[in-house]
UniProtKB/Swiss-Prot annotation:
The keyword Transcription regulation does not apply. This is Glutamate-1-semialdehyde 2,1-aminomutase. One of its GO terms (cellular component) is cytoplasm. It is found in: Cytoplasm. Pathway: Porphyrin-containing compound metabolism; protoporphyrin-IX biosynthesis; 5-aminolevulinate from L-glutamyl-tRNA(Glu): step 2/2; Porphyrin-containing compound metabolism; chlorophyll biosynthesis. Its EC number is 5.4.3.8. It comes from Prochlorococcus marinus (strain NATL2A). It holds the Pfam family Aminotran_3. Belongs to the class-III pyridoxal-phosphate-dependent aminotransferase family. HemL subfamily. It catalyses: (S)-4-amino-5-oxopentanoate = 5-aminolevulinate.
Length: 432
C-alpha cells in the first residue's frame, strides 16, 4: 500500500492563507480543488525536484507551469541573474538586454520580424487581440473551445485551464458585450471555422489558437488542420495567431510553427522565454508590429516590461536550449515517460489515451482518441484525482488538474523517469 504523506506544515500555511488571499492562492489551479485536496506548499526547487515545507521531495512534472525547461534554478541562469542583480532590478528605460533577447526570438521563431516584451502571457494575448483588430479594422475574433489565452474578459469564452477544470462555462463579471465579438469553434474542426467566416463576411479580424492545446490536457492538431487555418485566414483577409506561450521554445526551438511548418502572422509567447521570471511577448510581421505604439497608433505599455532580470534569465535559458542534442533528449525522455504510463495503465485494465511532443505530454482516462475539448471532457476526473493523490504519496508531482499538460525538462534523468513509471505501475496495480 502507498504510505500516507506528512503535510502538516502545508496544511497550516494553507489554512492561514485562506484568510489572507481568495481561496488561499494567487492562481486558482494551485488550490487543488480540481483534485479534491489541499495544496502542497513548496519551500524550494532544484533541477527536476521540488521540496515542500514538510521536507517531502517530489519529481516535478509541472515545472512552474512550463518555464522550467532547463530544470529549476539552473546554475548558469542563477549566476547570470546574480550578476545582473548587482546593476538593479528594473530600469523603466531601454536596456541592451532587451535587444539581445529580441534578436534571439526573431532568429528562432519563423513568424517574428519584430517583438514587444510584456510581463505575462495574458498581457501578450490581450495586446495581440487589440493589434489584430487595429490592423484589420475588424472586431470579431475566432478562438477554439478549450484553448486558454489568459484571463482577459474577451477570451473567457469556452476557455481551458482553470476554467475547464472547475467546470465554469465562463466567468461572472464578464459582460456579454465584451464577448459578443468572440466566436468559438471546436479545435481540429476546420469546417466549423469556414462556416464562421461565411456567416461573418469581412468582419473577422483573425483566428487565435494554441497550436497544440495544453490547457485542456494535451491535444495535438490533426494533419492539415493548421495548414487549413493558414489557407482560410489568407482567403478571408484575416490574421492567424499562434498562442505559443506554452509551446514556444518547448516543442522545438522555433516553437510549434517550426515543428509543423506553418507560419502564422502573429505569435504570443511567455514561460520559457523568461527562464522562470515573469515575462510575455508578442511578435510577428514588421508590417503588423509597426502598428504598435510608439511606432503606430495601437497603444500598449508596461512598467516592468523588458526588465533586466527577466531578459537575463531568458537569454541564458535560450542559450542552454540551443546546445546540440537538447530537443532530441527532451523528445526521448518524454516519450519514454508517456509510453511507460500508458503501458502501466493498460496492464491494469485502466482506460487511457495520451500523446507527447518533445517536452510536453498528457493523458486522459478514457479510451480516446481525444481531438477536441468535448472529447477531452470524457476523461474520468474522479479517477485522476485519486491518481494525483497517490502519486504525491509516491513522490511525484503532477499538475493538480486533469486538464493541464505535463512538462519534462533537461534536468530529468533516466532514473527520474524510471522511478515515475514504477510509481504509476504500483498505483495502477493497487487500483485494479
Amino acid at each position: 500500500m502507498t504510505d500516507a504523506l506528512n503535510t502538516k506544515r502545508s496544511e497550516e500555511i494553507f489554512g492561514a492563507a485562506k484568510n489572507l488571499m481568495p481561496g488561499g492562492v494567487s492562481s486558482p489551479v494551485r488550490a487543488f480543488k480540481s483534485v479534491e485536496g489541499d495544496p502542497i506548499v513548496f519551500d524550494r526547487v532544484k533541477g527536476p525536484y521540488a521540496w515542500d515545507v514538510d521536507g517531502n521531495r517530489y519529481i516535478d512534472y509541472v515545472g512552474s507551469w512550463g518555464p522550467a525547461i532547463c530544470g529549476h534554478a539552473h546554475p548558469e541562469v542563477i549566476a547570470a541573474l546574480q550578476e545582473t542583480l548587482e546593476k538593479g532590478t528594473s530600469f523603466g528605460a531601454p536596456c541592451v538586454l532587451e535587444n539581445q533577447l529580441a534578436e534571439m526570438v526573431i532568429d528562432a521563431v519563423p513568424s517574428v520580424e519584430m517583438v514587444r516584451f510584456v510581463n505575462s502571457g495574458t498581457e501578450a494575448c490581450m495586446a495581440v487581440l487589440r493589434l489584430m483588430r487595429a490592423f484589420t479594422g475588424r472586431d470579431k475574433v475566432i478562438k477554439f473551445e478549450g484553448c486558454y489565452h489568459g484571463h482577459a474578459d474577451m477570451f473567457l469564452v469556452k476557455a481551458g485551464s482553470g476554467v475547464a477544470t472547475l467546470g465554469l462555462p465562463d466567468s461572472p463579471g464578464v459582460p456579454r458585450s465584451t464577448t459578443a465579438n468572440t466566436l468559438t469553434a471546436p479545435y481540429n474542426d476546420l469546417e466549423a471555422v469556414k462556416e464562421l467566416f461565411a456567416e461573418n463576411p469581412d468582419a473577422i479580424s483573425g483566428v487565435i489558437l494554441e497550436p497544440v492545446v495544453g490547457n485542456a490536457g494535451f491535444i495535438t492538431p490533426e494533419p492539415g488542420f493548421l495548414e487549413g487555418l493558414r489557407e482560410v485566414t489568407q482567403e478571408n483577409g484575416a490574421l492567424l495567431v499562434f498562442d505559443e506561450v506554452m509551446t514556444g521554445f518547448r516543442i522545438s526551438y522555433g516553437g510549434a510553427q517550426e515543428r509543423f511548418g506553418v507560419t502564422p502572422d502573429l505569435t504570443t509567447m511567455g514561460k520559457v522565454i523568461g527562464g522562470g521570471l515573469p515575462v510575455g511577448a508578442y511578435g510577428g510581421r514588421k508590417e503588423i508590429m509597426s502598428m504598435v505604439s510608439p511606432s503606430g497608433p495601437m497603444y500598449q505599455a508596461g512598467t516592468l516590461s523588458g526588465n533586466p532580470l527577466a531578459m537575463t534569465a531568458g537569454i541564458k535559458t535560450l542559450e542552454l536550449l540551443k546546445q546540440e542534442g537538447t530537443y532530441e533528449k527532451l523528445e526521448a525522455i518524454t516519450k519514454k515517460l508517456l509510453d511507460g504510463i500508458l503501458t502501466a495503465a493498460k496492464e491494469s485494465n485502466i482506460p487511457i489515451y495520451g500523446q507527447s511532443i518533445s517536452a510536453m505530454f498528457g493523458f486522459y482516462l478514457c479510451e480516446g482518441p481525444v481531438r477536441n475539448f468535448e472529447e477531452a471532457k470524457s476523461s474520468d476526473t474522479e479517477l485522476f484525482s485519486k491518481i494525483h493523490r497517490l502519486m504525491l504519496q509516491k513522490g511525484v508531482y503532477l499538475a493538480p488538474s486533469a486538464f493541464e499538460a505535463g512538462f519534462t525538462s533537461l534536468a530529468h534523468s533516466e532514473d527520474d523517469i524510471n522511478a515515475t513509471i514504477k510509481a504509476f505501475k504500483e498505483i495502477f496495480s493497487e487500483m485494479s
